[in-house]
Structure formats: C-alpha cells, structure tokens
Amino acid sequence: MLDNFIANQATKEFSVSEISNKIKELLENNFGYIKVKGEISGLKIASSGHAYFNLKENTAILACTCWRPILAKIKFPLNDGMEVVISGKLSSYAGNSRYQLSVDNLQPAGLGAMLQILNERKARLEKEGLFNKIRIPIPFLPDKIGVITSITGAVIKDIIHRIRERFPTRIIIWPVSVQGENSGNEIAEAIEGFNNLEEINKPSVIIVARGGGSIEDLWSFNDEILVRAAYNSKIPIISAVGHEVDYTLIDLAADKRAPTPTAAAEFAVPVRSILNNTLQSYEKILLNNTSRLIKYHEQNIINYDKIHRYLSHYMNNKQQLLDETGFNLLDALPCFIELQETKIKSFSKERVNPAKILNYKTLELTHQTAYLSKSANNTLKNFEYKLELNSTLLASLDYNNVLKRGFAIVKGETGNFLSSKITAANEKIFNIKFSDGEIKVVRNTVIASD
C-alpha cells in the first residue's frame, strides 16, 4: 500500500510536516491495536513520570513510550533485559522521523521474568503480614455459598453438581473473567461485592475457582489487589485455582486452599447421606443414654423410698423412747424433789456457826504471821553474816592492803608488769608502785644475784 501511495503521489511535493502526518496516518490506520513480544532495553523514566525504552529482538529494535497513567497500572517494576508482551498502537514521532509503539498494557512474557516478579511480590506481601492472618473457619452447614468463577466452562458445572450431590444448598454465582488483563480486578471486586451484601443475602462461604493452566493463564490470581481483597474478606474464602500442583498468591491469603474446584465444593458442604447416618447414630446413642439415665433415676427413687421408710420407722422408735422417758421423768420428779428437800433439811442441822469459824481462822492467821516474822529475821541475820565474811575476804585480797604490808609492784617503761628476774633483765627504766605512791627508777648497773 505504501508503494502504491508513493507511485500515485510521485509528482506531488510535500512539506516535512505533511509527509510526517501522512506516514503517521498510514501506520495507525494499517496496524491499529497490536501486540508485540520482546526484551526491554535502554529503559528511562522521565521526571514527568513517562517511561521510554526499546523493545528488541536480536538486531531489531522498536521504540516504545509508556505514559504515566499506564505506567502506574503496571504492578511490577520494569528492568532492562525483562521479556514482556506489549499491547498498544503504532504511531510516528515527527520530532526525529521515527515510529514508536504507544503502550496500553504490558505483561511479563518469559517464565523466568514472571517467576521473579511473583517471588518479589510474594516476599513483599508476606512481609506485610497478608499471608499470616487468622483463618476464618469454614462453617459446617452453610446456608448460602458464593462462587466466583467464569460462567462458562466445566468448573462452575463441576462445583454445582458436586454441591447438589453432597448437600443441596443455595448457590450464588458471581461471574468473572478468570484470565486476561482485567480479571484480577474483577475477582477482587466480586469478593468485595459479596462482603458488602446485606446479611440476609450474604453467603456463608466464598469459593474462588478456576481450572488448570500455565503460569500465564493463572497470573490473574497472583494480582496484588486480589490478594488484599482475600485478606480483608470477612467471609471465609476457599481458593480452588488450577490443579493440586498449581499455587497462586490467593491460596496463601485465603482461609482454605482446595487442590481442585471439585474439592472446594467438598470442603464447603458435607455429604448429606453420611450426615443423616451420623445423625441417626447420634439419635440412637442419645436414646440409649436417655433410657439408661431414666432407669438410673428410677432406681434412685426406689432407693430413696426405702431410705425414707427406714428413717420413718427409726424416728417413730425414737419418738416412742422419748415419750417413755418423759413419762418416767414425770413419775420420778416428786420423789426427786422430796429427796432434795430432805438433804436441805439435813444440811441446815449440820451447818457450823460462822462466828466460830471466824475466830478459828483469826487464831490460825496470828500463828502464821509470827512464824513468818521469825523466819524472815533468821534469814536476814544469816545474809548479814555472810556479807561481813565476804567483805573481810575481799579486803584481804585487795593489792593496796598488800602494799601496806611492805610489798611493791614493779612495771616496765611501757607499763608492763615485771613478775620475775627474766622479765626485768631487758628493762632500763622501772616504775615502782608503793602503797602511798609511785617512783621511777633508772638502772645504771646490774648486780649479779641468784
């Protein structure tokens, strides 16, 4: 088409802006909205927030522009060397005569790049605590089950069939896209929508389900917005994405993970027949226990009746004994009173004159007083004698009295007592104490003596 255009316009003259606009028109009209896969290189993010980079493959390069609003929607960091798939429109930039791809959507393409993004996102969300929430228990018999999945395909049919087969209950389906650019947002909005329903319409449990697929097919279930919605849900969530070997980030934020959508239905409701059998078994156990309890209490009543009859008989006997004792007391009381009166009369005859007793006690007190006075005088005289004897002995032992008899006390210069020739041999100055005073003596010579 470009060749035909040039041939038809061979003789026409264009200005630079005219030919640039024509080229831009041809590019945009002939290519429109396209997808291109390649490797990012030369990434630059301007202060305006726009990103500029090249998409390369071997030696071919395609310039790309990602405007700030689009860049803000990309949920992972861009790096040189990252393999991506870009959706957008081709256009030309008249400023330097080049064509470029204006980015509308950008997704990781290579498995390695996707796993790197997934691991970085997982580590960041785990650090925030989004995978460590307190799990909400799945109710035993939910009255309503919310299912978030695609309305077409085998998944929704399997879930409905399995629930109806096990324990029929009301199912509320919230249809969403389970693959594609905006499916993560749709699923997150569905979770929030179920949580915002009135209590009467709100399901007891939510199943988020999708069939198996590649990591690219399941990528929406790694969306950060979806993970946060699952974390914030007040309704317990069962995640059933892919097969048993498939793990997505919603599995870590959900309250329970099911290996398959069918297993999620089994987690949501019990088997009705098994439940009925269990209830019947419990009913039999309850009836048997009730029957045994009734028999036990009947036997207790019989035993209590026997005890009551025995106690009645016992009380009657005791009452009879009490009555007989009362009668005997009434019969014996006159005799007892008469006996006591006789004793009182006898005591009256034998009682002693108080004046005689007083005279006797006065005389006895006089004798005791005289005896105590004499004993005290003797004891005092004995103490005085012993005191005088001890005083004489003490005076004889007083060294001052000894000094008066012509003896003296000899001390060294330091005041130490000298009691022998040996202790005085090394002393030059002596202090000699007599009975009437003390003198100091200085030794000049030593005269030998025995």
UniProtKB/Swiss-Prot annotation:
Entry's Gene Ontology cellular component terms: cytoplasm; exodeoxyribonuclease VII complex
UniProt EC number: 3.1.11.6
Reactions catalysed, as given in the entry: Exonucleolytic cleavage in either 5'- to 3'- or 3'- to 5'-direction to yield nucleoside 5'-phosphates
Pfam families, sorted: Exonuc_VII_L, tRNA_anti_2
GO molecular function terms noted in the UniProt entry: exodeoxyribonuclease VII activity; nucleic acid binding
Ubl conjugation recorded as keyword: no
Keywords: Cytoplasm, Exonuclease, Hydrolase, Nuclease
Matching NCBIfam families: xseA
Subunit structure: Heterooligomer composed of large and small subunits.
Entry's family note: Belongs to the XseA family.
PANTHER family per UniProt: EXODEOXYRIBONUCLEASE 7 LARGE SUBUNIT
Name of this protein: Exodeoxyribonuclease 7 large subunit
Organism whose genome encodes this protein: Rickettsia felis (strain ATCC VR-1525 / URRWXCal2) (Rickettsia azadi)
